Structure formats: structure tokens, C-alpha cells
């Protein structure tokens, strides 16, 4: 239960950091990857983080009335979701290899 609360806190901190700069996505991925038990969990946490941040970005665009314009810019939505997913998943995966919390398989 403590890990779940911690991960939710990391998601919120990463969202706050990514509002100012894209490095927040990497920092969030690093933190969730560090506290993951194995590689599969690190990839899932990185993917969930990226979808959470991108969903918040889409909600912000909808609030500002710019979502329709953003979605009509054909390659831009695809590039932005792929970059968001790649940054979070790769940083979570790399960090998991050096994590003391990861269960080492023999």
C-alpha cells in the first residue's frame, strides 16, 4: 500500500515537473523505474506514467479549447505521444537495472 501511494505521488510530481519542461517525464520515469520490483513492472509503470502525463496534456488542451486544433495537426499528436512514451519507458527501464529494489533473477 505504501508503494502505491508513493507511485501516485511520483506521478503527480512528474506531472508538475513536465508542465514546465519535458525533463519532468524523464525524472518521473527514473523514479518509478528505481522503485520497481522487476523489468516488466518498470516498463508498465513507465507506460502508465507517460499515458497519465499525455492524458493530462490533452485535458489541458481541451480546457483551453485547443484540442481540436492539436488533433488536426496530423503528425504532431503521434510524435508527441511517442516521445512521451519513449522517454518515460526508456528511463524507467534503464534505472531498474541499477535499482536495489529490483529482484535479481538467477
UniProtKB/Swiss-Prot annotation:
Membrane topology qualifier: Multi-pass membrane protein
Annotated keywords: Cell membrane, Membrane, Transmembrane, Transmembrane helix
Keyword check for Transmembrane: yes
Keyword Transmembrane helix: yes
Transmembrane segments: 5-27, 42-64, 76-98
One GO location term (cellular component): plasma membrane
Top-rank taxon, per record: Archaea
Compartment annotation: Cell membrane
Protein known as: Uncharacterized protein AF_0488
Lineage: Archaea, Methanobacteriati, Methanobacteriota, Archaeoglobi, Archaeoglobales
Amino acid at each position: 500500500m505504501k508503494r502505491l501511494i508513493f507511485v501516485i505521488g511520483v506521478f503527480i510530481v512528474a506531472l508538475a515537473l513536465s508542465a514546465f519542461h519535458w525533463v519532468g517525464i524523464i525524472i518521473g520515469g527514473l523514479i518509478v523505474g528505481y522503485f520497481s520490483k522487476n523489468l516488466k513492472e518498470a516498463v508498465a509503470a513507465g507506460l502508465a506514467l507517460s499515458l497519465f502525463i499525455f492524458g493530462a496534456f490533452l485535458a489541458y488542451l481541451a480546457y483551453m479549447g485547443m484540442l481540436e486544433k492539436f488533433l488536426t495537426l496530423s503528425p504532431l499528436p503521434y510524435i508527441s505521444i511517442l516521445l512521451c512514451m519513449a522517454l518515460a519507458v526508456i528511463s524507467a527501464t534503464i534505472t531498474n537495472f541499477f535499482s536495489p529494489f529490483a529482484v535479481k533473477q538467477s
